[in-house]
Amino acid sequence: MEKFQGYLEFDGARQQSFLYPLFFREYIYVLAYDHGLNRLNKNRSIFLENTDYDKKYSSLIVKRLILRMYEQNRLIIPTKDLNQNSFLGHTSLFYYQMISVLFAVIVEIPFSLRLGSPFQGKQVKKSYNLQSIHSIFPFLEDKLAHFNYVLDVLIPYPIHLEILVQTLRYRVKDASSLHFFRFCLYEYCNWKNFYKKKKSILNPRFFLFLYNSHVCEYESIFFFLRKRSSHLRSTSYEVLFERILFYGKIQYFLKVFVNNFPAILGLLKDPFIHYVRYHGRCVLATKDTPLLMNKWKYYFVNLWQCYFSVWFQSQKVNINQLSKDNLEFLGYLSSLRLNPLVVRSQMLENSFLIDNVRIKLDSKIPISSIIGSLAKDKFCNVLGHPISKATWTDSSDSDILNRFVRICRNISHYYSGSSKKKNLYRIKYILRLCCVKTLARKHKSTVRAFLKRLGSGLLEEFLTGEDQVLSLIFPRSYYAAKRLYRVRIWYLDILYLNDLVNHE
């Protein structure tokens, strides 16, 4: 394994030629095929974790495929004829898809090593838990309670594919890899219908890598300017991917930036800034005044439009005052709530009460959007009244019950951190009654008659693991039930979100 590590080092011109291992290094295929990156680096690749790797994509097959395509001169195929031209029994589009997958795997290897390099020599405990979606909420509860404003930014997508190619140029020195990458990208996609007709056949792993490269380019500039202008040392930039000749290019850019926009650079000197990116959006929390928040807003607009050539409207940047507005974050509605606290103090023979006010981040369930999602999937109507799931009546009773129980437990598992469980109980009620109506419709019976025949054992299946455990911890009393209603639990094993219906 140490031998593999030597060939995968990021530094050096030879390692920048990404087509070199694709063509000549057979043993690198094993690393890419069985996700051997976790052996080289304890922090597995983000790209490998976020997407499913289909076993049919073999690096050895792709290598042989490229050689045969060169021999038969089949590379030059018009995009409109991709589906009509067959090659070895498959359409040419299928082979471009295979090549794109393996290209992404090979390019991920040095980036994965660079991602883990800042953690070398540091003790990072429970790094797996840091990948959880819920791990960000305890951080926000601790930090956002001291901030005034939050900037909610929708990260724009590059419309033209050439912008993605130009972004990758900063990191890849190998010209042949770039030309091959551009060729496959244009042949694989009809870029005029990039988000419509070709969406079903696009490879998620390939374009996830392109999107992350584009976003990391933006974040590298943002954090670099903040680090250069701040008096406090920022360590957030360490986990970002540094592009080739980055400092030389940014120093020139910073010089122009200072000469033309000295006032805008001044706003970057605020050391109390927290930045979080999620689901194509980013959140910037700070203690600044409304005037400075508006400057931040137009700074992002100018950065995207002038430097990245991406059309970006100011309406995509929302300024939220946490004490008044709700921040929609990862399926929760977060806002600051004043929590009154009465403390009894006693000095010698005198006792008195002290009224304190504690600012707390309140995370609530967006019941309207969840009911809208349930209505879209035919679990209820738009008013939240449960209806039978007609498309599931052909399945067996156990299959229907398991589907509803799985969906109910997933929702309960994710929204267990809500400060108030009333909306969560309402969602559970909708799913339970929808399950009963679906089973009653299958057996051509009424809901009351079906429940009378089956008993209460059906509803016990919907009890989640946390409900059963907490009911054993707290005694069955009014105050215990009220305490259970307010218990907030954040789980550190939730790495991604799935569709409600299609999740298996």
Curated annotation (Swiss-Prot):
GO terms for cellular component: chloroplast. Disulfide bonds: none annotated. It is found in: Plastid, Chloroplast. GO terms for molecular function: RNA binding. Keywords: Chloroplast, mRNA processing, Plastid, RNA-binding, tRNA processing. It holds the Pfam family Intron_maturas2. HAMAP family: MatK (MF_01390). This is Maturase K. It comes from Arabidopsis korshinskyi.
